[in-house]
From Swiss-Prot:
Cellular location(s): Cytoplasm
GO annotation (BP), single: pyridoxine biosynthetic process
Function, in words: Catalyzes the oxidation of erythronate-4-phosphate to 3-hydroxy-2-oxo-4-phosphonooxybutanoate.
The protein, known as: Erythronate-4-phosphate dehydrogenase
Quaternary state and interactors: Homodimer.
Entry annotated with the keyword NAD: yes
Encoding gene (name): pdxB
Family of this protein: Belongs to the D-isomer specific 2-hydroxyacid dehydrogenase family. PdxB subfamily.
SUPFAM superfamilies: Formate/glycerate dehydrogenase catalytic domain-like, NAD(P)-binding Rossmann-fold domains
Organism: Shewanella baltica (strain OS195)
GO molecular function: 4-phosphoerythronate dehydrogenase activity; NAD binding; protein dimerization activity
Binding residues annotated for NAD(+), in chain numbering: D147, D233, G258
Length: 376
């Protein structure tokens, strides 16, 4: 069995090696000719899976995408061809949630404006939005959720309108899928009018899809309003973001919010489980066995940390400033965006860092944030 797989997916060999011949490929430049003889195709969001790519293949048994979203996959075409498909919903939700939370802590430090006491509006309450809310609520931050689709489906959480978030939130964090049609389309959800209407001193975080924001309009508005603080991980026109926009962001990264080692491993592992199910064989590999131990095994925690100490704790796991600096230095290079993604040293999630508990600190909230070892 020939398994064609994006070269940037981790842990493919230990998981799929016993199931067939693994053929790594460049996901962004993948051609129909390369796919022609594949039995299994495993992709990421950079690969457009459609009739143009697959029409020459008559033996495909399974298509898997190690992503939360599916907007890069023509699901109707796969259904028409009776080709089984699976993605990995929620695989990197924790990573994105922690990324957004860390970015807010970094902004708080940079501008000497504590995160504690601010109101955060989360637009999109699916997997990544929920993970972001979990971090914030563990730290005692008031969160407003906006998700008209979840609300209509009967989700029991309390939701507010986008207008309410824009009026009340000090920080807005975007976590919606990209939809280009329909009542709740999200393409250019934040157009020039909405961007201009943001309340003074808003922190604006985008970790979902670049064209949820009109990037040209964002440049125009930001140039007029220095009070707006931007954290941008996604960009319209990836992998070539508008060069004028990058310097306007406080933190800029190349679509890597979900790039934790745990999240990437989880995405590959979910596809492994699905393929085993499809082939009616036992999935006998373990996700925990794949992950290496963290290089800093434990941190002593004598008292509940203040915000500055919490940021230092978070930086043990991931220092956003490093990726921001590297991106600014490389994004204008040929293939700089994709090269940084490909060579990214996947960060760890909070759970990789064990906290030694002395029995005196009030640290339940750190456990809720995801750190391990608390209370043990």
């Amino acid at each position: 069995m020939k398994i064609l797989v994006d070269e940037n997916m981790p842990y493919v060999e230990p998981l799929f090696g016993d199931l067939g011949d693994i053929i790594p490929v460049n996901g962004r430049t993948l051609t129909a000719e390369q796919v022609r003889e594949a039995d299994v195709l495993l992709v990421r969001s950079v690969t457009k899976v459609n009739a143009e790519l697959l029409s020459g293949n008559n033996k495909l048994k399974f298509v898997g995408s190690a992503t939360i979203g599916t907007d890069h996959v023509d699901l109707a075409y796969l259904a028409e061809r009776n080709i089984p498909f699976s993605n990995a919903p929620g695989c990197n939700a924790t990573a994105v949630g922690e990324f957004a939370f860390i970015a807010m802590l970094e902004l708080a430090q940079r501008f000497n404006s504590p995160l504690k006491g601010k109101v955060v509006g989360i637009v999109g309450a699916g997997n990544t939005g929920t993970a972001t809310a979990k971090c914030l609520q563990a730290y005692g931050i008031k969160v407003l959720l906006n998700d008209p689709i979840k609300a209509a489906e009967g989700d029991p959480r309390s939701f507010v309108s986008l207008e309410t978030i824009m009026a009340q939130a000090d920080i807005i964090s975007l976590h919606v899928p990209i939809t280009r049609t329909g009542e709740h389309k999200t393409k250019y959800l934040f157009d020039e009018a909405r961007l201009k209407a943001l309340k003074p001193n808003t922190w604006f975080v985008n970790c979902c899809r670049g064209d949820v924001i009109d990037n040209q309009a964002l440049i125009k508005v930001k140039q007029q309003r220095d009070d707006l603080k931007l954290v941008l991980d996604v960009w319209e026109g990836e992998p070539t973001p508008l060069p004028e926009l990058v310097p306007l962001a406080e933190f800029a990264t190349p679509h890597i919010a979900g790039y934790s080692l745990e999240g990437k491993a989880r995405g590959t592992f979910m596809l492994y489980q699905k393929l085993c199910q499809l082939l009616n064989i036992t999935a006998d590999k373990s996700l925990l066995d794949l992950l290496p131990s963290f290089n800093i095994k434990a941190v002593e925690l004598a008292t509940a940390p203040n915000e500055k100490a919490l940021l230092q704790l978070a930086r043990f796991v991931y220092d956003l400033r490093d990726d921001d600096k590297m991106f600014r230095n490389t994004f204008l290079n040929e293939n700089g965006f994709d090269t940084m993604r490909k060579n990214h040293q996947h960060r760890r999630e909070f759970s990789a860092l064990a906290l030694a508990y002395d029995g005196q600190s009030e640290v339940d909230w750190l456990s809720n944030l995801g750190f391990s070892g608390v209370g043990q």
